Amino acid sequence: MSKPSLDLQILTLPDNPGVYQYYDKDGKILYVGKAKNLKKRVSSYFNKIHDTAKTNVLVKKIVTIKHIVVPTETDALLLENNLIKTLQPRYNVLLRDDKSYPWICIKKEPFSRIFLTRRMVKDGSEYFGPYTNFKMVYTILDLIKELYPLRTCNYDLSQSNIDSGKFKVCLEYHIGNCKGPCEGLEPLEEYQRQVNAIREILKGNFKESLKDFKKLMNNYAQNLQFEEAQKIKEKIEVLENYQSRSTIVNPKITNIDVFSIISDESAAYVNFLQISHGSIIRSHTLEMKKKLDESDEELLELAIIELRERFQLMSKEIIVPFEIDLGENIKTTVPQLGDKKQILDLSIRNAKFYRIEQLKQLQIVDPDRHVNRIMAQMQKDLRLPVEPRHIECFDNSNIQGTNPVAACVVFKDGKPSKKDYRHFNVKTVEGPDDFASMTEIVYRRYKRLLDENQPLPQLIIIDGGKGQLSSALKSIDELGLRGKVAIIGIAKRLEELFYPGDSIPLYLDKKSETLKVIQQLRNEAHRFGITFHRDKRSKAALNSSVESIPGIGEKTMLTLIQHFKSVKRLKLATEKEISAVVGVSKAKKIVDFYKTN
């Protein structure tokens, strides 16, 4: 891959947290790193000479950059940890298992112990985490210890050992940190109830535990132990802000493949995440060019078969966004909530980012090709005789007929041409009559273009349904432009497209780039019109207000309108601020007027 191609990969990286992977010309992994902002972090490698020769050698070898987008920087840290262990890149300091992030373990044994560990032992015990913040782990363990007096000893508390009196209570019992299950002083059922409550805390369900904390806090307060009550309050706040699990890693999800798909009119993008032993170890996105009108279901089935064969995937369960048929030997899961749904959402997010990057690269490498493709697609979708290189869209704005205005926005080659935007004060219409207003402004716009011998658009879009379109057509007919300029109306509720003389609207695919361009035009016309209407209302209100002030003439009124823009700003201004605009004498009159009115 050439250097410009590498620059292009960097340029189109997202500004999101994630993990990046560097590969050499032979496709071998060189380095894995995490980033709060992928684009900034990766760019930094190529924008300077590094202090170490090793890093400079690494940069020279990089040919391909891959990345995985994740929700947070913490998730990036965890995923980096997993990928370094799995891929063992040459330029990374390899992370060994005894350097892993810590977990909280609920031991599978009578009177379960709860403790911090770096190793997961497959003995039926439960593990929660991993945690990147050690302070948070110790805070949680301290909370558990304060709220629930559990044992910390390593005794084998089988019923026979307890009955035989093999063990004696220790100091923890005497200072109130343990209820003495080793001597049978605490029933197993009561102990298990506390373990269940702790399990809910670690799962993120704090309701019952928070009730217990608040009860403890209130008891301290009633006993005038305000310092202790404050400590519990602070721990409640920590617990409420705590998120107990990573969306990237969950030990209960193991040996599962996740597939998601997003598509547009011409292509589909299938992302694949491989989960092994509770961790993401691989991510890949496959682009599929559509040849016919294939459904997402058909494309996803084809992609899954291709990816499973390419990467020799043997998992018996896959997570997908909708039901598909892959035969009896593969279980498909369509999660609606929980950890599996979060991982599916992450896969979808990576597919979306991949598509955005591909489109960005196309725009940078060959911007004309990108525009030409959209224009050709619009001509086809809208059944136009020519490509709509010049489009104009109209929108009316008025509130109960007051200050009626209209806006016309212009797009050229699919992009806003703001220097060509125009707004109109409606002159010939009385009251709230949007249809008559549309007739007037369309006539004025194209009468002027014809008089000045200016180029006409290839497409006119009217914001509104059949009624608004019919009103615009009156002017088009009067000017003799019927058949010379294409004109359509768009109804907001269902995004229906109406054509002259056709009672049945056209519905475009919601993913259609054509529809997106039309929606952008409509929204821009609405924004431009509303802004103009708001300014006009403010000036009208200020004009009316200033006219009522004795001793203030038309010239002063105009000066005030130009400076303060609205009545509210004029009323809030100090006498000194007003005098700087119109003089001391007139400023006093204005301030006195607003004090009494």
Swiss-Prot record:
Residues 207-242 form the UVR domain. It is found in: Cytoplasm. One of its GO terms (cellular component) is excinuclease repair complex. SUPFAM superfamilies: C-terminal UvrC-binding domain of UvrB (SSF46600), GIY-YIG endonuclease (SSF82771), RuvA domain 2-like (SSF47781). GO terms for biological process: nucleotide-excision repair; SOS response. Residues 15-93 form the GIY-YIG domain. This is UvrABC system protein C. It comes from Flavobacterium johnsoniae (strain ATCC 17061 / DSM 2064 / JCM 8514 / BCRC 14874 / CCUG 350202 / NBRC 14942 / NCIMB 11054 / UW101).
